[in-house]
Amino acid sequence: MVSAQLHFLCLLTLYLTCGYGEEGKFSGPLKPMTFSIFEGQEPSQVIFQFKTNPPAVTFELTGETDGIFKIEKDGLLYHTRALDRETRAVHHLQLAALDSHGAIVDGPVPITIEVKDINDNRPTFLQSKYEGSVRQNSRPGKPFMYVNATDLDDPATPNGQLFYQIVIQLPQINDVMYFQIDSKTGAISLTPEGSQELDPVKNPSYNLVVSVKDMGGQSENSFSDTTYVDISIRENIWKAPEPVEIRENSTDPHPIKITQVQWNDPGAQYSLVNKEKLSPFPFSIDQEGNIYVTQALDREEKNSHVFFATAKDENGKPLAYPLEIYVKVIDINDNPPTCLSPVTVFEVQENEPLGNSIGIFEAHDMDEANNINSILKYKLVDQTPKVPSDGLFLIGEYEGKVQLSKQSLKKQDSPQYNLSIEVSDVDFKTLCYIQVNVIDINDQIPIFETSNYGSKTLSEDTAIGSTILIIQATDADEPFTGSSKILYKIVQGDTEGRLEVVTDPTTNAGYVKIKKPLDFETQPVSSIVFQAENPEPLVKGIEYNASSFASFELIVTDVNEVPVFPQRIFQANVSEDAAVGSRVGNVTARDPEGLTVSYSLKGNMRGWLKIDSVTGEIFSAAPLDRETESVYRVQVVATEVGGSSLSSTADFHLVLTDVNDNPPRLAKDYTGLFFCHPLSAPGSLIFEVTDDDQQSLRRPKFTFALGREGLQSDWEVSKINGTHARLSTRHTRFEEQVYNIPIRINDGGQPPMEGTVFLPVTFCQCVEGSCFRPAGRQDGIPTVGMAVGILLTTFLVIGIILAVVFIRMRKDKVENPQSPENKPLRS
């Protein structure tokens, strides 16, 4: 009140010293004006001084004054009470100037008072408890319920901008939040983890504590409120149906219902997504979720179909993830056997013995493999010519093996036979044809043009696929038959299979190529022996001899190579409490040239490890800490000793297993806990604890107790779950002060760790539900004595000014005796 009076007197002094004849910031002529005033200001605050000219002698103020706004005769406009924006945000007034008879001589003009907002209202939830439900596997980010709070402050200013957040989720499994809230709208939805993991069988309900703050949640001085949210988890019936089987080429009337999907609530709009972009797409869905096949399907064209069913709301937004629909097309026997080629050609030597296999004949059926519809039977139905007799050949009924059945063949009887083969499945038959060419007997062996191809020197880094030698053998048997075709193989000197020989079918030349990398260290010199042979067997009495063999010497030269690790990543596990100097792992590398290898570490940023440069053994060099780094990664460098000092690297990962070496602690800062004094009833507060050790898949199991004897009569601590507890008062007789309550917490580990934390709980007077702390003495703010001095000084200045004014007026009367003020009144 004193400060308000001082403010009013200062303004009055300013008006008096400035004079009424000059227009300034605080005074001016009568005209339409708009003023902005913060709500909550002390009363008797001067707003403006309006000035007018004779014959006006006073003012009249009308409109939405609400008994608050007044105007003095000299035009001082002020308010008598503190303004409240929530009661009226804008006051529309009318101001007129009146003469001595009360008649309007100027105006009225509109005067607008805009009440500016201050943060004098706390946000309040519309309900102290909300209840909602959500289906498992619902789409993350899609709201399933809202919490709403109101704040009477101006929503266009930060004072009325609300910020929602989830403070506690119970239960909270593995520190994973299953729910999220839109900080501006209060919309609650599932997180991606919640969409995947919520299961009504495991946890049918969850409890949330939600807070709302004004000032957009950005100020420490913002007001807040909390509410409780109970959420039940409902089973999701939006599930993919079992795979569907449809028999191909159905003659039933279409469309045919094959399966159904169903959204959890009525009103969903269903559609199918053609994943494979088939045209036309042979499936449809109605608004009951029934899925139909719209036309006959062909298994040979496509043996299965995969597409998706979607459910959307009335705005076309997806309600959940699409469901995969799998349709398998069941085979029917609708395809006859087919021949792989118009004519299959086999060769047989003269005089081959009875029963020899000539070849394996194969046909194909497009019906489903390993199915009765695709099992084929073979039958020989004709032989041309029938010389020297019919029935010279036979074929296996199922395997298709063609053999000589009566006697050996002679080229002079017929150089060629044509066989007709009937191939059949359950319902169909097809004729295929085999041509059997009778060729000269294989009585000539391949002969190399030289028995020694000398030597060749190559570096060990010669590219794979390079041709290093061409060898040649000849065969005097009938050209372009199996008796004269030559195949080359390496029979000696290449046990690792580093080389291969490819035959030119026209010239029978053999191209020797590198198949695998050469290696100087394992085989610097190779004595290679080639053999040339025919695919057709030699006649009895003829054997391959030295003419069918040739030799070659391959010399491999060294290329200096980096040391080689047997693997790219080495990994070891060790307990974080391992003693300094403990052996934690070992790495090895080999230098291809046989040089000694030296080991060193790279990227050992924390200095936790050291390595034996000779053996590659790795030891701890400092205390390890899993909470600082659970997997410590370094690189091991292997360097040649001598030579070119080439080096290579491998990764070493040290996985630290946890030791229960961290005591429990509060999960966050709890310095803002308070109760309004005096307590009307016993109250309680919820707090959360954690520790820095690795949490197992099971939830933490902290236990709680008061940390000092004698507190049990005033306080009680009770466990909510493995991480949360409730601190409750046992009575209401607490003094207005801060209580630091010790809480003893045990983590139940092996070995168990115990810690004592202190919860500061303040008992204080409350204003609008928040703790009110009166401000102390601050520099720059006047004391009561100073205020009295200022007040007396102000009165003194006013007295001097008034004296000057009266003296000047008296002087004017003397100098102007006929002025209107000095004329006597007429009778």
Curated annotation (Swiss-Prot):
All ranges on the Cytoplasmic side of the membrane: 808-827
Extracellular side: 26-786
PROSITE patterns xref list: CADHERIN_1, CADHERIN_2
Span of the signal peptide: 1-25
A single MF term (Gene Ontology): integrin binding
Location relative to the cell: Cell membrane
GO biological process terms held by the UniProt record: B cell differentiation; calcium-dependent cell-cell adhesion via plasma membrane cell adhesion molecules; germinal center B cell differentiation; homophilic cell adhesion via plasma membrane adhesion molecules; integrin-mediated signaling pathway; marginal zone B cell differentiation; oligopeptide transport; positive regulation of integrin activation by cell surface receptor linked signal transduction
Residues modified by glycosylation: 148, 249, 418, 545, 573, 586, 721
Residue stretches making up the Cadherin domain: 29-127, 128-243, 244-339, 340-448, 449-565, 566-666, 667-776
Tissue: Highest expression is found in intestine with lower expression in spleen, bone marrow, lung and testis. No expression detected in liver, kidney, heart, brain or skeletal muscle. Expressed in precursor B-cells and myeloid cells.
Primary subcellular site in the record, as a coarse category: membrane
InterPro entries noted in UniProt: Cadherin, Cadherin-like_dom, Cadherin-like_sf, Cadherin_CS
Keywords: Calcium, Cell adhesion, Cell membrane, Glycoprotein, Membrane, Metal-binding, Repeat, Signal, Transmembrane, Transmembrane helix, Transport
SMART domains (alphabetical): CA
Transmembrane region(s): 787-807
Any single GO CC term annotated in Swiss-Prot or TrEMBL for this entry: basolateral plasma membrane
Membrane topology, from the record: Single-pass type I membrane protein
Superkingdom of source: Eukaryota
Domain remark from Swiss-Prot or TrEMBL: Three calcium ions are usually bound at the interface of each cadherin domain and rigidify the connections, imparting a strong curvature to the full-length ectodomain.
Summary of the function given for this chain in its UniProt record: Cadherins are calcium-dependent cell adhesion proteins. They preferentially interact with themselves in a homophilic manner in connecting cells; cadherins may thus contribute to the sorting of heterogeneous cell types. LI-cadherin may have a role in the morphological organization of liver and intestine.
PANTHER family with a match to the protein in the record: CADHERIN-17 (PTHR24027:SF419), CADHERIN-23 (PTHR24027)
Name by which UniProt lists this protein: Cadherin-17
